[in-house]
Design a protein with these regions (language model features):
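Register position in tetratricopeptide repeats
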Residues: 19, 53-54, 87, 119, ...
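Residue-level recognition of tetratricopeptide repeat
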Residues: 15, 49, 83, 122, ...
Length: 218
């Protein structure tokens, strides 16, 4: 007979170990909980967080695959499994995962639908299927027209092809409006002006991008 307090104590102890930076010991505790009580979603989530933090891709795949069986209505496991496959360059597996995930996301969860379509767009772009990539980005923006990652990526990819530059400029402008201090989005905006031959605005925004880039050495 299982004592629920055993898993509760292990959960608390595991969380304490995480706070102390003892990730291996914490991982061991959470793994024990998932074996004692496979339906303990919180323990699986902690395990997944540790695997993501340490970029242990095979472990992310193991956890997400098992959690898909245990929690078939939880789209987050499809999301991270897709990312893991993408990291391994298993693009078809990633696509299949996101498309399966879309099936279980309620229509009302427009933000998550948008994120999944954004990921699908990124995969198609990676395998150089531009029409499908742009179709997926359009779907993403249909669900959430303020999906800033999609707005930026879509705008940037269009500008690289020198295609639909006015649309690219509009999307990039919105990304910058939503996150005015994001150097990546400012850089994209500058690049689009540069491609269009508007060097004055390109210079203004590239300087702004550099001023906001905290990664550069002083």
């Amino acid at each position: 007979e299982q004592h629920p307090e055993d898993t509760d104590l292990k959960q608390m102890y595991g969380s304490l170990l995480v706070a102390q930076g003892k990730t291996d010991e914490a991982r061991f505790q959470f793994q024990l909980i998932t074996e004692m009580e496979p339906s303990n979603a919180a323990a699986w989530q902690q395990l997944l967080n540790l695997a993501l933090k340490s970029e242990d891709i095979p472990e992310v795949i193991r956890i997400c695959t098992r959690c898909q069986e245990l929690f078939p209505d939880a789209p987050e496991y499809y999301f991270y499994l897709g990312i893991a496959y993408f990291q391994q360059e298993k693009y078809q597996d990633a696509l299949d995962t996101y498309k399966a995930g879309l099936e279980i996301i309620p229509e009302t969860n427009v933000g998550l639908k948008s994120d999944f379509y954004g990921q699908i767009g990124d995969i198609y772009y990676q395998i150089k299927n531009m029409p499908e990539a742009y179709k997926a980005y359009d779907e993403a923006l249909k669900y959430n027209d303020k999906n800033v990652v999609v707005l930026n990526n879509y705008a940037y990819f269009l500008s690289l092809e020198k295609k639909d530059l006015k649309k690219a400029e509009r999307m990039s402008a919105l990304a910058v409006k939503l996150e005015p201090n994001n150097p990546t989005y400012l850089d994209t905006y500058a690049w689009i002006f540069f491609v269009q031959g508007n060097y004055t605005l390109a210079k203004i925004y590239i300087e702004s991008a550099l001023a906001n880039d905290t990664t550069k050495s002083s």
